């Protein structure tokens, strides 16, 4: 079994749930609701030089991680909405590494993305809290993937995703003594 790089995956890799568990779903919703606050704590007090430091060699800068979380959250929110309102929609992936190179991800301060996350995650959590178990069993079909993804798995994935990137920033701060 391959060893997981603890700098790249400080909380481990994503493990997809095999079945719907209401208690777990509530934990995932809480993580999604809490991401903006947790991320603000992780980046609090960092100066421009620190924000422009890659979290690992060859990795994104802290600022790019923040902007990536805004990009990924927008995509995930829309995937959730499509999954709830359409029958098995095909959802397009986004070229994360290319998006991380765009001017808004490389030049813009992080505050606009943090503000976007505040509003978006409040709406996303409200949507998730309104969903029934049947809604969580609805699916989306990621373009190019084999099979469908139930919305409870999508929710778990993005709960993990936010914690994963926040932990990358926190880990960098700890390693650098910031």
From Swiss-Prot:
EC nos: 3.-.-.-
Top enzyme class: hydrolase
Compartments in which it is found: Cytoplasm
Superkingdom of the source species: Bacteria
Cofactor note: Binds 1 zinc ion per subunit.
Gene Ontology annotations for the cellular component aspect, listed alphabetically: cytoplasm
Cofactor dependence: Zn(2+)
Family recorded in the similarity comment: Belongs to the metal hydrolase YfiT family.
Function recorded in the entry: Possible metal-dependent hydrolase.
Family matches, as NCBIfam families: PRK13291.1
Name of the protein: Putative metal-dependent hydrolase GK0616
Organism, scientific name: Geobacillus kaustophilus (strain HTA426)
């Amino acid at each position: 079994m391959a060893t997981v790089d603890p700098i790249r995956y400080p909380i481990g890799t994503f493990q997809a749930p095999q079945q719907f568990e209401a208690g777990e779903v509530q934990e995932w919703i809480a993580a999604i609701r809490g991401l903006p606050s947790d991320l603000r704590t992780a980046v609090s007090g960092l100066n421009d030089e620190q924000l422009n430091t890659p979290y690992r060699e060859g990795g994104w800068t802290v600022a790019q991680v923040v902007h990536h979380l805004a990009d990924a959250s927008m995509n995930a929110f829309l995937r959730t909405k499509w999954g709830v309102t359409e029958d098995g929609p095909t959802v397009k992936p986004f070229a994360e590494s290319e998006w991380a190179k765009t001017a808004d991800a490389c030049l813009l301060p992080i505050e606009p993305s943090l503000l976007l996350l505040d509003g978006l995650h409040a709406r996303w959590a409200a949507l998730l809290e309104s969903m029934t178990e049947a809604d969580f069993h609805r699916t989306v079909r990621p373009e190019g993937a084999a099979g469908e993804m139930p919305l409870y798995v999508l929710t778990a994935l993005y709960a993990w995703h936010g914690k994963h990137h926040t932990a990358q920033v926190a880990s960098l701060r700890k390693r650098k003594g910031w």
